[in-house]
């Protein structure tokens, strides 16, 4: 199943981005076949990362000064959706690692030079949860901590690590510290039930000096005073963090729903139900009702998720501000997209029969991966709905992720 809306090619960058999407389409059969290998390895196979690099996926949100396309973010997320439909872990890691090129573009030029100066294909992993801190020292910060859940960390040579800035024993700022691989270790601890192939291991840092230019405050991102905006002026870099980050988490999950749907329909088309006197599943009217309901919810999840991103980007291209109402709607629909996707996968999985429990059955893998993705903080529906509800009554948002 493919989404009901096609991708428009509005400019030369979009045409190039479309060629990246075409390249992704060519890779999908291989990525699907490697899904079990990714789980066994507990990280994405090296060949897959190399192939994504080759087709230009990681260039989609990278600044043009580094050979990137700095394209319409809906095209990036469309690529993520397609990858997630082939392998949940691959969609997850590609989304997170891919969006980091957008994040790095907001850092001071000196930081970008240090990461990409010798090789613009260098990748950055992350763990934004505040599991460590940076103490103010002369010229920068002394950082220590142990950051869990750094997806794709084995394929990166730098890391964004989130946490507070401490001065005189008190937090005075909050943001991301950018640290090279030579100054942190990775603890291999990723033994999990879902998203097994993401290699979301723990990054450990002890008393590492981080210069000022390699720290970016979330406040600077939100009020558009980030140093990187002086050199990277494309509209995509003005997108709100509160839209970009949560969408990065939801897009692969909706992709998993598309993958689960396709796997379910293919399976049902061949399935004979022994419990019902050899009835062919495709002749069961109730089976058709279930797939129709699932298809509708999955399409609507994607339409709303990507539609809000497109609406925000269209305003930025016109030089206009994004109203808070739209940002609140984007968060509302982002968590709703995750919920719709997972409930659709549940509906399909429950109707797939006992053979769906086999390790080589794609439906069970998508089911596990989607539920694993749901536990990410960006998918907590109550907080996002509260932002929207408060705004409807003229009350403050009480949350920063918007």
Give, region by region, the residue ranges found by the protein language model:
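Glycine-rich phosphate/cofactor-binding loops in nucleotide/flavin-utilizing enzymes
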Residues: 352-402
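Generic structural signal for well-ordered, non-transmembrane alpha-helical segments
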Residues: 255, 292, 296-299, 331, ...
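C-terminal helix-coil-helix/basic helical segment that borders enzyme active sites and/or dimer interfaces
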Residues: 32, 36-39, 299-336, 346-357
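Glycine-rich flavin
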Residues: 44-54, 58-156, 170-172
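Buried hydrophobic positions in well-ordered alpha/beta secondary-structure cores of metabolic enzymes
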Residues: 79, 143-145, 205, 257, ...
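DPxDG-like acidic metal-binding loop motif
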Residues: 146-184, 188-189
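Basic/polar N-terminal segments that are highly enriched at the extreme N-terminus
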Residues: 1-26, 398-402
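Glycine-rich beta->alpha junctions and the first turn(s) of the following alpha-helix
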Residues: 200-298
């Amino acid at each position: 199943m493919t989404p009901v809306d096609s991708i428009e090619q509005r400019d030369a960058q979009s045409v190039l981005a479309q060629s990246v999407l075409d390249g992704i389409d060519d890779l999908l059969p291989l990525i699907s076949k490697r899904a079990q290998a990714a789980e066994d390895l507990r990280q994405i196979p090296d060949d897959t990362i190399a192939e994504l690099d080759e087709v230009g996926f990681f260039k989609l949100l990278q600044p043009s000064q580094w050979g990137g396309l700095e394209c319409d973010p809906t095209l990036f997320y469309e690529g993520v959706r397609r990858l997630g439909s082939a392998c949940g872990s691959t969609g997850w890691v590609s989304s997170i690692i891919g969006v980091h090129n957008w994040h790095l573009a907001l850092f001071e030029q000196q930081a970008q030079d240090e990461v990409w100066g010798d090789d613009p294909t260098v990748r950055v992993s992350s763990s934004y949860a505040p599991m460590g801190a940076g103490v103010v020292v002369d010229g920068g910060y002394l950082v220590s901590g142990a950051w869990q859940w750094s997806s794709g960390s084995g394929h990166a040579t730098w890391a964004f690590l989130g946490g507070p800035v401490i001065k005189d024993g008190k937090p005075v700022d909050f943001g991301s510290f950018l640290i090279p691989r030579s100054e942190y270790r990775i603890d291999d601890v990723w033994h999990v039930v879902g998203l097994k192939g993401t290699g979301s291991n723990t990054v450990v840092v002890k008393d590492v000096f981080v210069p000022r230019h390699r720290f970016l405050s979330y406040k600077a991102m939100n009020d558009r005073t980030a140093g990187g905006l002086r050199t990277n002026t494309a509209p995509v870099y003005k997108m709100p963090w509160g839209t970009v980050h949560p969408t990065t988490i939801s897009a692969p999950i909706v992709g998993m729903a598309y993958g689960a749907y396709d796997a379910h329909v293919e399976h049902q088309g061949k399935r004979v139900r022994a419990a019902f006197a050899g009835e062919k599943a495709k002749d069961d009217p109730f089976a058709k009702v279930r797939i129709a309901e699932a298809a509708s919810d999955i399409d609507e999840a994607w339409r709303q998720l990507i539609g809000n991103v497109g609406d925000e980007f269209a305003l930025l291209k016109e030089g206009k501000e994004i109203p808070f109402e739209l940002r609140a709607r984007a968060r509302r629909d982002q968590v709703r997209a995750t919920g719709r996707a997972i409930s659709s996968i549940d509906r399909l999985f429950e109707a797939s029969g006992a053979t769906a429990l086999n390790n080589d059955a794609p439906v069970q893998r998508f089911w596990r991966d989607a539920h694993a993705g749901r536990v990410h903080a960006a998918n907590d529906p109550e907080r996002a709905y509260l932002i929207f509800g408060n705004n409807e009554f003229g009350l403050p948002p009480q949350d920063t992720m918007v």
